[in-house]
Amino acid sequence: MIEINSLKQKVYDVVRAIYDVHGVLGPGLNESCYQEGLQIELKEKKIPYVREMSFHPQYRGIPLEAIFRVDFICKDDIVVECKAISDITGNHRAQLFNYMRLLQKQCGILVNFYPFSAVVERYFFDKETNQIIATDGHVIYDYNRR
């Protein structure tokens, strides 16, 4: 079982950086502007990150030719997926959840910079149970029940 409160603390400074970027740039820009701003903010805050990390998913242990790119991996265990759209949908959440599962990362942040107030959603992946967990502890998605 994962410890939600310690994971919330782990992502806190990344979430703070996200809000700082939105505070400076404001709403309504395109995604790449916010990604560049976040890269600068992470660097200034000395938060370790990799931008646009590419990976090949696997099918039954065999790497596929398909390539996925994650916007940011912070602190080696936090997937950050940036959007600049009118509304976040279930498909955007599914994208983040799959990145977390495929990369075996415990924390995921889905951010929508487009609205007047940035929308930040945090999720956690329990590697033991293969479940996505919300910040309040309830199971959002169970990969064992597909």
Label the model's feature ranges.
Residues 26, 70-88, 99:
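Conserved catalytic cores of phosphodiester-cleaving nucleases, focusing on short active-site segments
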Residues 83-132:
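Nucleic-acid nuclease catalytic cores
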Residues 1-25:
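Interdomain/boundary linker segments immediately adjacent to catalytic/signaling cores
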